[in-house]
Amino acid sequence: MKAILQVINLVLISVVVIIIPPCGAALGRRKA
């Protein structure tokens, strides 16, 4: 179970790192 959770966490982190920067920049521009 722990190994599976670690894999899921790694996948989620990688997805967030890949997807969030452009979205964060767009949201930051909209808020600003």
Swiss-Prot record:
Keywords: Amino-acid biosynthesis, Branched-chain amino acid biosynthesis, Leader peptide. This is ilv operon leader peptide. GO terms for biological process: amino acid biosynthetic process; branched-chain amino acid biosynthetic process. Transmembrane segments: none annotated. The gene is ilvL. The keyword Amino-acid biosynthesis applies. It comes from the Bacteria. InterPro entries: IlvGEDA_leader. Disulfide bonds: none annotated.
